[in-house]
Every structure is written in C-alpha cells, then in structure tokens.
Amino acid sequence: MQIYPLRLLPNKIDFDFMNFKKVSYTFSIILSLISFIWIGIYKFNFGIDFAGGIVIEVRLDQAPDLPKMRGVLGKLGIGEVVLQNFGSERDLSIRFGSSSEENLMKNIELIKASLQSNFPYKFEYRKVDFVGPQVGRQLIEAGAMAMLFSFLAIMVYIWVRFEWYFGLGILIALVHDVILALGFMSMTKLDFNLSTIAAVLTIIGYSVNDSVVIYDRIRENLRKYHKKNITEIINLSINETLSRTILTVITTLLANLALILFGGEAIRSFSVLVFFGIIAGTYSSIFISAPILTMFVNRKFNKKVIER
C-alpha cells in the first residue's frame, strides 16, 4: 500500500516573501516599541512566585479534589490562589498574595471558612508562612540567567552548525519573540510566575527549531543553485519548507488549545503565552531570521556555509 504525504499546499509554491522584508521589519520594530512602552507604563502582573505572599500548609483526611478547590478559592476575590500537593496526596500547600497587612488575617480566615463550608474534609492547618519579595527577586534573577544562558547556548550551536551570521539572525528573531511575549503578558495581565518563565524558554526552543529547518534548506540550496542570488535562495527555501511549517504550527497550536481549555487555572498563563509565542516564533522564522541573512551573506562568503 502506497503512503501519500500530507500536504496543505501544492508542491510548487513561488510566493515572494522577500518582497515583504521591509514591511515585516517595520512591523516588528513597531510591535517591539509598543511592547517596551506598555511594559514601562503598566509593568507586569507578578504572581506569588515573584511578588511574595502567604503559604498555608494543610493536611486532609483524604486526597482533595484540587480542580474544584481551585475553582472555589478563585472566586473569593483575593487574587491568584495556587494549590499544590507536596509530600503525600493528602498534604496541600495553599499560596496567595498579600495585598496589605490589614487584609492578611482576613484573607486567611476567608480561605479557611470557604474550605470548611464547601468540602467535607477534615482540615489540619500545620503552618502559615509569609514569603517576602526578596525571594521573588532571586527567582527573577534566576529566570533572567536561564534565558541568557539559553541565548548563548543557541548562538554557539548555530555558529558551529552554520556560520556566525546565521546565529546572529536567530538571536535577533529570539529577542523579537521574547519582547513580544513579555509585551503580550503585560497587556493581557497574565500572571508573571515561574510557569511563564518556562513558557518563554519553550517559545525560544520552538522559534529556534523553526529557523533551523529553514536555514538547513538555505544551506542545501546554496549547494544546488550556484547561479541564484541569496534573495532567490532564501525565497525558494522558505517556500519549500512552508508546508512543513504550517503543519507543525497547526498541530502544536491545537495541542496547546487543549491545554488552555482543559488544563485548568494552574497552567493557564503558561498555555496562553506559549500559544501566542508559537505564532510569533513562526512569523519571526519566516520574516526575520531568514530575510536578515541578506545583510550578511553574499556569494564570496558562502563557501564555508556550503562545506559544513
């Protein structure tokens, strides 16, 4: 039985992506500036991980229904409430932000009363701790270092596999994606917590993967078509990988949409940010990281790239 590959687009596509190079650069610069300005004015909605808050440790007589608990506590109007098991499935950690000292005891009692009235469990409150913003600052620094090291590792990988200007093209695209993702977080008031740091790193990985696929095809076409200029080769390479790019982005977005709809509040910020980042990463791999090579690559420099 013959197996036919799934194709969303015809085999021969000749769309002139490079004709939109200046438009895409201008569009990206405007979006990046808007993101910077918005972040500067409205800041981020820091979650408990970074802003600090209260941690209540509870032991129950049986395993709790966490999704239902999150729904009940989320309606109390005290901001983000994070519930997690630790140790055994009967041990529960409840974290929430502390807006002011006056509301501190009030919110703790509100949570206790809500749990008692809505659930048939026996609650043993073992510890109540305050987590200060100093811990949050340390986590922010650790997250920033994680992103920095990921940038450096990617640069080295691309440099070894291709050439330095390929790495520079990907770096510019990644900075673009991260700026837009952070701007999107600020505009939509998504909670800035540890899961969103993981989301940004996921976006970086996805964007790099997309760009490397196109770069590989560019290098292959440099070997095949000696008389074409770099603009023609980049256009050809993007068109040849377009079907794969669209299939990948659709399947990834569908999987991520399931997380947004059914994953619950605990991973909502992660899922929404990754959904946006996949779109931004796909755009940047086609309209930024590939076209930007025309600034660095010409025929006299292509020999080293072709030989790798």
From Swiss-Prot:
Listed InterPro entries: SecD/SecF_arch_bac, SecD/SecF_bac, SecD/SecF_CS, SecD_SecF_C, SecD_SecF_C_bact, SecF_bac, SSD
Mainly resides where?
Answer: membrane
Q: Which keywords accompany this UniProt record? A: Cell inner membrane, Cell membrane, Membrane, Protein transport, Translocation, Transmembrane, Transmembrane helix, Transport
Q: Which cysteines are joined by disulfide bonds?
A: none
Similarity annotation: Belongs to the SecD/SecF family. SecF subfamily.
Job of this protein: Part of the Sec protein translocase complex. Interacts with the SecYEG preprotein conducting channel. SecDF uses the proton motive force (PMF) to complete protein translocation after the ATP-dependent function of SecA.
Protein name, per record: Protein translocase subunit SecF
Q: Which organism is it from?
A: Rickettsia massiliae (strain Mtu5)
From the UniProt record, report the name of the gene that encodes this protein.
Answer: secF
